[in-house]
Amino acid sequence: MLMNIGKVDNIKIYTLAEDYAGYNSPFWSQHGLSFLIEVESNGIKKRILFDTATYAEPILFNMKLLNINPKSIDMIILSHNHFDHTGGLFGIMKEINKEIPIFAHPNIFKVSFATEPEFMLAGTLNKTLKEDIEKLGGRWVLSRDPIRLMPGIFTLGEIEDEEKINFEKKPTIGLYKLENGRVVLDNVEDEIGLAIVTEKGLIIVSGCSHPGIVSMVKKSIKISGINKVYAVIGGFHLIDADNERIVSTIKALKKLGVKKICTGHCTGFKAENMFMEEFKEDFERLHAGKIIKF
């Protein structure tokens, strides 16, 4: 699977939402993740909103501090259906108030839930909200396959089971879903990521990396044919992982040549510390308001 991808000339990533606001910071934190990715490629300039965290209000507040007008957003990517990545969508769409593509997996509207310590829905998207978003101008682009968004940028599509490396085949989260009226384990097959091609190499942006961040990086390489990986940004969902899983993840990313790690959200303090020890000055902790330039 190879795409004629192209590459971007300039990229800047604004962290609009994250669980940590940073020390002595004016920015608001919240549970979840949201990035504004500003790119320029072959004279084309776009602003891509990647995920919408749990609530719109803190995102809009942080956008105002960063002098970003919501109406300047050109497209939206929803990494997966969990509430801490989709909850702010309606409120943000009200501010965007124009026709705009929303890229996601076809299963993003599935019923997904936890049963411990009690029943709780994991996702907030449903048919009614889907239609409400459409009334505000949202145009759903639901695909299992990768999609090239512009020169140098593409979605990863679904990470199939056979594409996952062995140690990432075990789910990192205990969720269930309804499938033909039956309760089955949810492996979060609806998670997609984003890859960006730069002079320095690939940059991979993830929401929670439920399919496994290493498998997502390998999928990016497979799609693009580019073996050089510069940075991996987002949540890795290693918060409940044992040391063996974390060490395996770090070793695999190092073997793939990943230079920089920018992580937070669901990665977990233990894993973050282990990444920091290995990547040293090339490790960065995400926080609301953080701007990453390449």
Swiss-Prot record:
Coiled coil: none annotated. Keywords: Magnesium, Metal-binding, Transferase. GO terms for biological process: 5,6,7,8-tetrahydromethanopterin biosynthetic process; pteridine-containing compound metabolic process. One of its GO terms (molecular function) is transferase activity. It catalyses: 4-(beta-D-ribofuranosyl)aminobenzene 5'-phosphate + (7,8-dihydropterin-6-yl)methyl diphosphate = N-[(7,8-dihydropterin-6-yl)methyl]-4-(beta-D-ribofuranosyl)aniline 5'-phosphate + diphosphate. CDD domains: DHPS-like_MBL-fold. It comes from the Archaea. Substrate binds at E116, D186, K228, H265. Its cofactor is Mg(2+). The keyword Ribosomal protein does not apply. Pfam families: Lactamase_B (PF00753). The keyword Transferase applies. It is an enzyme of class 2 (transferase). Pathway: Cofactor biosynthesis; 5,6,7,8-tetrahydromethanopterin biosynthesis. Its EC number is 2.5.1.105. Belongs to the metallo-beta-lactamase superfamily. Catalyzes the condensation of 6-hydroxymethyl-7,8-dihydropterin pyrophosphate (DHPP) with 4-(beta-D-ribofuranosyl)-aminobenzene-5'-phosphate (beta-RFA-P) to form 7,8-dihydropterin-6-methyl-4-(beta-D-ribofuranosyl)-aminobenzene-5'-phosphate, a precursor in the biosynthesis of 5,6,7,8-tetrahydromethanopterin (H4MPT). To a lesser extent, is able to condense beta-RFA-P with another arylamine, 1-(4-aminophenyl)-1-deoxy-D-ribitol (APDR), to form 7,8-dihydropterin-6-methyl-1-(4-aminophenyl)-1-deoxy-D-ribitol. Dephosphorylated beta-RFA-P is not a substrate. This is 7,8-dihydropterin-6-methyl-4-(beta-D-ribofuranosyl)-aminobenzene-5'-phosphate synthase. It comes from Methanocaldococcus jannaschii (strain ATCC 43067 / DSM 2661 / JAL-1 / JCM 10045 / NBRC 100440).
